[in-house]
From Swiss-Prot:
The encoding gene: wtf5
Top-level taxon: Eukaryota
Region span, Disordered: 1-65
Localization of this protein: Spore membrane; Vacuole membrane
The protein's name in its UniProt record: Meiotic drive suppressor wtf5
Pfam families for this protein: WTF (PF03303)
Binding partners and assembly: Homomer. Interacts with other proteins that exhibit high sequence similarity.
Job of this protein: Acts as a suppressor component of the dual wtf meiotic drive system, and can suppress but not confer meiotic drive by compatible poisons. Wtf meiotic drive systems promote unequal transmission of alleles from the parental zygote to progeny spores by encoding a poison and an antidote from the same locus; the poison is trans-acting and forms toxic aggregates in all spores within an ascus, wherease the antidote is spore-specific and targets aggregates for degradation by the vacuole.
Organism annotation: Schizosaccharomyces pombe (strain 972 / ATCC 24843) (Fission yeast)
Family: Belongs to the WTF family.
Chain intervals with Basic and acidic residues compositional bias: 19-30
InterPro entries, A to Z: WTF
């Protein structure tokens, strides 16, 4: 069978391809003449040259601006030694307080002191060798504690704010609630105490006995007093107290306003 395949490209497209193949890349410039046997004379932008000599762009980009962040050895030793001193300061202060620091030391005390110095020396070496590790751990711990303190403070502030709003709303809606509690308290003092005394003194004569019904009746009366005061916000007693306060305030204002009027009249005269 004959292949009847015909190219879809037009003659104009084929001429454009031939032109582009023979055109010179203006960015790279003309290709230099080189010997195919010598590898060193390959053009710099050929594929073979790129494989043999990969660009060091990543290394060159990161070669500038790099600084050595390692701390000097003297500073590391100073920080490690300071941390050991702070760790041993409470023990030294305690021995000074007991007046037992380098005083009447025996073999056991000097042995313990030598072991203590050995431990401090090993700790200094350890802290110096693992300086970056333990400093990072300390930083992370301090940051975590600061965040915990911040979250706790915010939580407590929100709790206090919510409690304040709740108390304010409670007092606004049930403004006579404190008066109800005070009335129940006074009722228990004025009625409960004489009741117990009368039962103790005249119990045998009048036949008064401590029964469950007596306690239930007293509790029910206390609850009724509380309900009678809180069933309607702004009871007569609360309104009476407000009225007395308002009248007292007006009297004070009147007493203070009279001398001012007299002083103004005298100054005008």
């Amino acid at each position: 069978m004959k292949n009847n395949y015909t190219s879809l490209k037009s003659p104009l497209d084929e001429e454009d391809e031939l032109k582009t193949d023979h055109e010179i890349d203006l960015e790279k410039g003309p290709l230099p003449e080189y010997d195919s046997e010598e590898e060193s004379t390959l053009p710099p932008y050929s594929d073979h040259a790129l494989v043999n000599n990969p660009p060091n762009t990543h290394r060159e980009n990161h070669s500038y601006g790099t600084t050595d962040n390692s701390s000097p050895l003297l500073i590391i030793l100073l920080i490690s030694f300071t941390s050991i001193i702070l760790f041993n300061a409470p023990e030294v202060c305690y021995l000074k307080y007991k007046d037992a620091f380098f005083k009447n030391y025996g073999a056991a005390e000097w042995t313990l002191f030598g072991f203590w110095c050995l431990v401090c020396t090993l700790a200094l070496i350890f802290l110096t060798y693992f300086y970056e590790t333990w400093t990072k751990a300390v930083k992370v711990t301090v940051i975590s504690l600061a965040k915990c303190v911040k979250v706790t403070a915010i939580f407590l502030a929100q709790c206090v704010k919510a409690c304040g709003k709740g108390i304010k709303h409670f007092l606004k809606k049930w403004e006579n609630m404190p008066m109800a509690f005070s009335e129940v308290f006074l009722f228990n003092i004025l009625v409960g105490s004489p009741r117990m005394n009368l039962r103790y003194i005249f119990g045998d004569r009048w036949g008064l006995k401590c029964s469950l019904a007596d306690h239930i009746i007293f509790v029910v009366l206390s609850i009724l007093v509380f309900i009678a005061e809180t069933v309607k916000p702004g009871s007569i007693r609360v309104n009476l107290i407000r009225k007395m306060g308002y009248e007292a305030k007006q009297q004070v204002n009147e007493y203070t306003a009279v001398p001012l009027r007299e002083m103004n009249s005298e100054s005008e005269a």
